Amino acid sequence: MAAPMTPAARPEDYEAALNAALADVPELARLLEIDPYLKPYAVDFQRRYKQFSQILKNIGENEGGIDKFSRGYESFGVHRCADGGLYCKEWAPGAEGVFLTGDFNGWNPFSYPYKKLDYGKWELYIPPKQNKSVLVPHGSKLKVVITSKSGEILYRISPWAKYVVREGDNVNYDWIHWDPEHSYEFKHSRPKKPRSLRIYESHVGISSHEGKVASYKHFTCNVLPRIKGLGYNCIQLMAIMEHAYYASFGYQITSFFAASSRYGTPEELQELVDTAHSMGIIVLLDVVHSHASKNSADGLNMFDGTDSCYFHSGPRGTHDLWDSRLFAYSSWEILRFLLSNIRWWLEEYRFDGFRFDGVTSMLYHHHGVGQGFSGDYSEYFGLQVDEDALTYLMLANHLVHTLCPDSITIAEDVSGMPALCSPISQGGGGFDYRLAMAIPDKWIQLLKEFKDEDWNMGDIVYTLTNRRYLEKCIAYAESHDQALVGDKSLAFWLMDAEMYTNMSVLTPFTPVIDRGIQLHKMIRLITHGLGGEGYLNFMGNEFGHPEWLDFPRKGNNESYHYARRQFHLTDDDLLRYKFLNNFDRDMNRLEERYGWLAAPQAYVSEKHEGNKIIAFERAGLLFIFNFHPSKSYTDYRVGTALPGKFKIVLDSDAAEYGGHQRLDHSTDFFSEAFEHNGRPYSLLVYIPSRVALILQNVDLPN
């Protein structure tokens, strides 16, 4: 555990250390003003900031700045020169020799040797043919041949490979030299950074209802219009970085610079991003820099014949739970590789930012395994923190926001590390948002362990509002994690097997389906309205996609049955899925109009345990939820900050959302100067059971 500096030790030492930290970190005073409880850890922020600044300075002195340093992909790998020749470069510090082989030389392993340079680098120039044509044409198969110090001959894919494919029944991927005559020309500029972030988490491969791997083209033509129609302004693309094992959900990366070929070509991914931009939708990449696949024949592992090339050697270089390799973030060339990878996806594919996967694993030497984070600040400082990894994340955020000031970075961190989403100038991590990972766990816990009448309103509100001041959160009721095999989506927890038999509008509501549809809407709206400064939905869950996600693997006889999204269910007018889809669409459109995600955190005026009522105000709107399974309330008094006439702008009980139409939308609700629940005004409202309402004060300017 950390040993914080405390005034009790020697007051003069404490003050001196605090003043030194404030002098070194430009805006640390602001961070400590926001959260005075961080004062004992000022020296930790000082050390982290100085380490970040020193590496940035070293990069400037030795590489000409981070701009040049992050362009590694322009020289490493294999490149066509202006004269038609080929320039090749690799970093393989443990190799005895490096060679290039492939179709072009009949797979002779040793006819094209690289020349050894300083610092473990190797380079090769191959002149063009006599007729000036390229010796290695577009589409050629290549391999780097490594001779190890122990005498082994190893066939490897360049870590900088831009395209790899697996042909037929081959176990391993092949490296394809991707050098098309014409590159994709982007037609549309990046959209402006949205004031409110409404994210549609997507996986290209499962985006079809057919039992197959869907394509970039399919996603562009069929899924993008749905996302636009639903009112989402951001797509988060999973499983794009190449991964040999499809069932890893894209989290065991083998080729970091290659867009997955199982969905199509690099140009087709570029077209997908470009088309999204034309719709005003920004696109984030789910980037995996927390670990890498153990594959060596088609991955980074043992690239130069040693276990310490890109990774820590020994036990520190392996994540036992994930069975994967862990980067040595203090290594100069690994920093070049990872920062260049960030830049590659920003510039080559025009992604608008990143969701960083596995940040908790990066931040701590214990990787978060077996750790129940209590929120005690000592858990976030001291020897358990991997400050090399934290410094890399600061560098990555610095690079992203320098290259594209409007870009967005999101941290997947379950630990709740303070200041992770504070500016680097304050000593923070520099992320724009963090995922509010406790929220989906709370909903699943309630559905699994509690009867509806035992739901604790205060507990729900606490989970939805428990976030650090001025560190923005992405709220979500469920993501891909909750849909994976072994778990269930919210809809399946609520309705289970009845989704197969009782979702037709031609049959009466059963109690299970009625409860499921009403609570599904309420859970999503209260998460959207109260839970954060951004909102995320995993594809298909907007309409209550049945079942779970399970990728083809030996354990399910390589079946694609659960690795698809049945969008046709919401297009069928005779099925009730359309009601949930309609509600999701109108919830997003209303947020676009009023911007509650960009507004200050809500004021919760009521969380009544007996009545099961939650009421709060945000962005000038009054949100009211009645979670009681059977009780409706006539003339229920709800507090409000400002006087005026109120009208219903969203009603989960409306017919188009599969509700029971118990509310008259022509009704006007007038406030009176009657103080209630700490609010100076209040109004009387009819609140049916299992209903969520949003009221607008029409006397206020919109």
From Swiss-Prot:
Changing residue 257 to L: reported impact?
Answer: In GSD4; loss of activity
Location of N-acetylalanine modifications: 2
Q: Which CDD domains match?
A: AmyAc_bac_euk_BE (cd11321), E_set_GBE_euk_N (cd02854)
The record's Gene Ontology biological-process terms are: generation of precursor metabolites and energy; glycogen biosynthetic process; glycogen metabolic process; negative regulation of neuron apoptotic process
Q: Which domain of life is it from?
A: Eukaryota
Q: Where is this site: Transition state stabilizer?
A: 481
User: Which spans are transmembrane here?
Assistant: none
Q: Family per UniProt?
A: Belongs to the glycosyl hydrolase 13 family. GlgB subfamily.
From the Swiss-Prot or TrEMBL record, give the protein name.
1,4-alpha-glucan-branching enzyme
